[in-house]
């Protein structure tokens, strides 16, 4: 779980920015989006094969 403690003289905005970065780095948002809808196993295999073919390029 991502946790951010507010430091002395730190604004709420900067703490929120740090929190968002931690969530992004942990992959929590992408996991939530992935689990929003059911994905059939055949489609999951197809997506993984496509990602492997691309080789993780940007």
UniProtKB/Swiss-Prot annotation:
Keywords assigned by UniProt, alphabetized: Ribonucleoprotein, Ribosomal protein
GO molecular function: structural constituent of ribosome
Chain positions covered by the region annotation Disordered: 38-58
GO cellular component, one term: ribosome
Disulfide bonding pattern of the chain: none
Example GO BP: translation
Biased amino acid composition, Basic and acidic residues: 49-58
NCBIfam families: S21p
Similarity comment text for this entry: Belongs to the bacterial ribosomal protein bS21 family.
Protein name: Small ribosomal subunit protein bS21C
Organism of provenance: Nostoc sp. (strain PCC 7120 / SAG 25.82 / UTEX 2576)
Lineage summary: Bacteria, Bacillati, Cyanobacteriota, Cyanophyceae, Nostocales
């Amino acid at each position: 779980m991502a946790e951010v403690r507010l430091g002395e003289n730190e604004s709420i905005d900067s703490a929120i920015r740090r929190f968002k970065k931690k969530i992004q780095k942990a992959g929590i948002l992408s996991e939530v989006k992935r689990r929003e809808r059911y994905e059939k196993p055949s489609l999951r295999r197809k997506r993984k094969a496509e990602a492997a073919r691309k080789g993780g390029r940007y």
